[in-house]
Amino acid sequence: SDTNEANANNEAEAVSADTVIIADTQCPTSLDLAQSWDSWYTSRWGITETLYKLDENLEPQPFLAQSCEMIDEDTWVINLRDDVTFHNGNKMTAESVKKCWERTGEINARFNELLYIDNMAADGQTLTVNTSKPVPAFMNGLCEPLTGIIDVDAEGDPSVSPVGTGPFEAVSYEVKTRAEVKKYPEYWGGEPKLDGAVINIIGDTSTLAMAQ
């Protein structure tokens, strides 16, 4: 529950000022943001990010993107930030976003119901998206964790070590057991204040209560 997560976070903050230890009762099936609802965890754990994010008024605001403009009812032009790198040091470009979204769309049908992408064209930091029908809530869709960005050309298994753009990069993941992340010093938003985090997965809520 939200209460359990809040308590776990409070406990974690008291454990260490540099690396937090968090207890949670739920976990993803993998760290591959394209699978199921796993992107919600990679987003919450600071591994992946989206082009837009909701502000306190639930209005979409630019994040990895600088702007998103509707040219006509079926065409959107997205201009990306020029200072974002993946955890392997590669620059995030329109081509890398295009490749990531193509992969996610092939794996997860829910992605296609968010943005209804028909085709995309990448040019430097500009991505032009043509949709199969008008999508008035297109920018809201860009806030959904499933539309987060990873470097699909990166080495390694994205289900264990996805290469995202967030303040933290994946170190290890054991399903239903434990996850660990460490800070990405070159994060575009500034070096993270924490060195990392350990997320212990405790399926038994009674055990979680005792741990608190």
Can you name each region flagged by the protein language model?
Residues 16, 72, 121-123, 175:
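Residue-level recognition of beta-strand termini and adjacent short loop/turns
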Residues 1-20, 59, 103-106:
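Short, low-complexity disordered leader/linker segments with a strong preference
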Residues 66-107, 128:
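Aromatic- and charge-enriched surface segment that lines or borders ligand/interaction sites
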Residues 89-91, 206-212:
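Short helices/loops that flank or line small-molecule/ion binding pockets
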